[in-house]
Amino acid sequence: MSTLDAAYKNLVKEFYANANVEGEELKCWVCGKTFFVTPAYLAEILHINRPMLRNPLVYDDLYLEEDLLWEALSKDLEFSPNGNSINVSSLSPELRVLTIIMFHNLYPLSSTKYMNLGRALFLHNQISDVEIDICAHIFHILRKTVIRTDSRICIPFCCLVSRILKLKGIYPSADESPHPKPSPINLRTLNASIGHSKKEVKSES
């Protein structure tokens, strides 16, 4: 999140805490303002032309044949013992990079070691030119996060939610100014840290 968006941290939490699922829309209440979020609204603010899909896929609910993923992702693909997920490290370097981008931007996940078969199909469709209703997908993630009131491991799409709040005229109060970010590590500090780590390895050996 940028420095400006960091000021919205508490408002984003309020968004998820107060939202209710009403069919194919989220009824939201933040700072006394009520508004609705739908896939169509997301397409409007993100300037996305949605594909004409009668029933957009809900990737979390899908069960896949292993052969499909082996053919598209990797012949060396490793599945978990129960067959419900794949080992990310068994993907090619290019797909691992795409997976990390996917995890951080489109399909939040608390661990990047394994991904379930639904996320694997999402990855497969990205590299196979299969149409994805990304707005329906984002709405599904928002909806799922709202429903999981007691088990929110991560809060997804913080920047998107803060943008929605801005468009609705909802801003943080003056006493919620963001904390200053720490300065980045300079090259001298980085080299010193690497040298210190090498000394520790030698002493252990």
Model-found features: residue ranges?
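A structural signal for long, well-ordered, hydrophobic/aromatic- and basic-residue-enriched core segments
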Residues: 1-202
